[in-house]
């Protein structure tokens, strides 16, 4: 895919780490990296408008192939003019392959060489998602960046199982490349798997790099392993990927994990975390994790995060946010979701500046101490 519509441009490498500052050029515009991508599962980032996403600095969003295939259907979206037009988003979109949802949501799934048969979680009907079908759906959606179909083995599965799994994922990747109908306006990424086994990650990366994808995703992390185990896998995996292609760590959104991924050379991240925890009133702030629903904030008339200049923090108090959430008002979820997304996008902006200034390790130390990780024992 040497004439790929997705191009990575390296701007600067950080002197003391593997971090890199760059930009990714797509058919729907260019965005800076490292970048966090908000997740729009059902062709919407929950409770946020496209205008709000642009306002907070989101250069690209992610949407889910599995969910859009089942409802409203990829062919309907194609008739609407593609996903960009359907959801009124004129900037880059990345779609996943649907594989992770099949493994995590669907019932009675069965993995064969052909693909994965499963029960539709909406109506119980039996369906098959194959490498070719995953590509066909994404071709209909018209995303800028597509994912090849993979199996995501659990981190602690036995070596022999993971070995068979990555070999099948490589065969599926090759089939997906052959099925790709729109290589000139949609980039396709391969997904490196291998659980925690260095030799299997190496084999997976070698297979996929030889196929010359537009970029490479690192899958099978943030699925229950420790933070240290994830960092150890990233330490060797990013080294196996080409310098002239984007690197994407899937499903990671905790602030310290984002910084640690960047330190190891990752360019792109996505996660439902900021919006999911916002719906329960959990907010990421410059002083750490804050559950604004808690009784201690009932008469707290200060901003959610005094150091944040997002719409929520500029206009509303902790007491008001608590009231909205306790009263089950959607506006409360909109405001906490906006803040959490803004917080992570702004964190990545600070990370990009730290790479420019060659002080990313100092920034990490300052951020982690201030966020209070060691006090709470939690990573968000």
Curated annotation (Swiss-Prot):
Quote the record's cofactor note. Answer: Binds 1 zinc ion per subunit.
Task: Say if the entry is tagged with keyword Metal-binding.
Answer: yes
This protein's record includes keyword RNA-binding: no
Q: Name one GO molecular function term.
A: tRNA-guanosine(34) queuine transglycosylase activity
Any one GO BP annotation for this protein: tRNA wobble guanine modification
UniProt entry keywords in alphabetical sequence:
Glycosyltransferase, Metal-binding, Queuosine biosynthesis, Transferase, tRNA processing, Zinc
Catalysed reaction(s) here are: 7-aminomethyl-7-carbaguanine + guanosine(34) in tRNA = 7-aminomethyl-7-carbaguanosine(34) in tRNA + guanine
Look up the record and name the cofactor or cofactors this protein needs: Zn(2+)
Pathway(s) this gene product operates in, as recorded in its UniProt entry: tRNA modification; tRNA-queuosine biosynthesis
- The annotated active site, in chain numbering, is 96 (proton acceptor), 270 (nucleophile)
According to the UniProt entry, where is the signal peptide?
Answer: none
Which parts of the sequence are annotated with region: RNA binding? 251-257, 275-279
Where does the chain bind substrate?
A: 96-100, 150, 193, 220
Q: Name one GO cellular component term.
A: cytosol
Entry EC no(s): 2.4.2.29
Give binding positions for Zn(2+).
308, 310, 313, 339
InterPro entries, per this entry? ArchSynthase1/Queuine_TRR, TGT, TGT-like_sf, tRNA_ribo_trans-like
According to its UniProt entry, what is the function of this protein? Catalyzes the base-exchange of a guanine (G) residue with the queuine precursor 7-aminomethyl-7-deazaguanine (PreQ1) at position 34 (anticodon wobble position) in tRNAs with GU(N) anticodons (tRNA-Asp, -Asn, -His and -Tyr). Catalysis occurs through a double-displacement mechanism. The nucleophile active site attacks the C1' of nucleotide 34 to detach the guanine base from the RNA, forming a covalent enzyme-RNA intermediate. The proton acceptor active site deprotonates the incoming PreQ1, allowing a nucleophilic attack on the C1' of the ribose to form the product.
Family stated for the protein in its record: Belongs to the queuine tRNA-ribosyltransferase family.
Could you describe the subunit structure of this protein?
Homodimer. Within each dimer, one monomer is responsible for RNA recognition and catalysis, while the other monomer binds to the replacement base PreQ1.
Family annotation (PANTHER family): QUEUINE TRNA-RIBOSYLTRANSFERASE
Instruction: State the protein's name.
Output: Queuine tRNA-ribosyltransferase
Q: Taxonomic classification, please?
A: Bacteria, Bacillati, Bacillota, Bacilli, Lactobacillales
């Amino acid at each position: 895919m040497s004439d790929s519509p997705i191009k990575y441009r390296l701007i600067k490498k950080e002197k003391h780490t593997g971090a890199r500052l760059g930009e990714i050029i797509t058919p729907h515009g260019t965005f800076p990296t490292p970048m966090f991508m908000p997740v729009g599962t059902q062709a919407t980032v929950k409770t946020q408008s496209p205008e709000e996403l642009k306002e907070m600095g989101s250069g690209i969003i992610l949407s889910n192939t599995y969910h859009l295939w089942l409802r409203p259907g990829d062919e309907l979206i194609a008739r609407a003019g593609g996903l960009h037009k359907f959801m009124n988003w004129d900037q880059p979109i990345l779609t996943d392959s649907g594989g992770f949802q099949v493994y995590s949501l669907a019932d009675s799934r069965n993995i064969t060489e052909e693909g994965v048969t499963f029960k539709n979680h909406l109506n119980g009907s039996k369906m098959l998602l194959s490498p070719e079908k995953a590509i066909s759906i994404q071709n209909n959606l018209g995303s800028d960046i597509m994912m090849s179909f993979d199996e995501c083995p659990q981190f602690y599965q036995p070596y022999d199982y993971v070995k068979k799994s990555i070999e099948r994922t490589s065969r599926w990747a090759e089939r997906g490349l052959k099925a790709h109908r729109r290589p000139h306006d949609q980039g396709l990424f391969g997904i490196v798997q291998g659980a925690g086994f260095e030799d299997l990650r190496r084999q997976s990366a070698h297979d996929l790099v030889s196929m010359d994808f537009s970029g490479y995703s690192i899958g099978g992390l943030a699925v229950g392993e420790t933070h240290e185990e994830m960092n150890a896998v990233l330490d060797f995996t990013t080294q196996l990927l080409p310098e002239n292609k984007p690197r994407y760590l899937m499903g990671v959104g905790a602030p310290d994990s984002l910084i640690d991924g960047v330190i190891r050379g990752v360019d792109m991240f996505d996660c439902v975390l900021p919006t999911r925890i916002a719906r329960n009133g959990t907010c990421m702030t410059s002083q750490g994790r804050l559950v604004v629903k808690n009784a201690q904030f009932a008469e707290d008339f200060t901003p959610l995060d005094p150091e944040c200049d997002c719409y929520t923090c500029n206009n509303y108090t902790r007491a008001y946010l608590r009231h909205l959430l306790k009263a089950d008002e959607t506006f409360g979820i909109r405001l906490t979701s906006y803040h959490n997304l803004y917080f992570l996008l702004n964190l990545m902006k600070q990370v990009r500046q730290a790479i420019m200034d060659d002080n990313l390790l100092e920034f990490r130390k300052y951020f982690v101490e201030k966020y209070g990780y060691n006090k709470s024992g939690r990573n968000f």
